[in-house]
Amino acid sequence: MPVLDILVEGMGHINFAQEMIDRKGITDRVTLSGMTLMNWDVFLLPLPDAWVSALPAGKADQTRPGTFFRGTFKVEKPADTFIDMTGYRKGVVWVNGHNLGRYWDIGPQTRLYCPASWLKAGENRVIVFDLHQAQALSLKAVGAPDQ
């Protein structure tokens, strides 16, 4: 039996004027090879910090987007910093189990603020969930926000 997986991202709603009925997600029938799919399941992907931190390491399928990437970086002395997401497309970043927030390559922001209190001297963990990227890229920590 064919299987169709669909990931829908909710980017918020317009909550004023005539656009109040601003539907998001799957708003019409779902078809596969011209046939309407029935009896399908919908479930949330809430991404709580503890669940993301506990994800097992594994080799990413480099042909499919929607991937979690995991890495580490060393810090001598924790300080406020910014994680530069240049090269990634759209997703969420966690450092040491803390959700830094969303990024999107359309800008204007390409750097996410990471407070010193979320870093530790020595090795730190970073997890990136990118909706479009299929291959991991290097990240860079910088001392200033976008210019």
PLM features per residue range, with description:
Residues M1, I14, D80, N99-E123:
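A cross-kingdom feature marking solvent-exposed beta-strand/loop segments within repeated
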Residues L4, F73-N96, Y103-W104, V126-F129:
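Aromatic-lined ligand-binding clefts that engage carbohydrates, nucleic acids, or primary amines
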Residues E9-M38, Q133-Q147:
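Glycine/proline-rich low-complexity spacer/linker segments in large multi-domain proteins
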Residues I14-N15, T81, V92-V93, L100-G101, ...:
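Short loop/beta submotifs within extracellular cysteine-rich repeat domains
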Residues L44-F69:
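Edge strands and adjacent loops of beta-rich recognition modules
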Residues Q62, G66, R89-K90, N99:
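C-terminal effector modules of nucleic-acid-centric enzymes and ribosome-associated factors
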Residues T63-E76, T110-L112:
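Short beta-strands within extracellular/lumenal beta-sheet-rich domains
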Residues Q109-Q147:
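Terminal leader/tail segments of proteins
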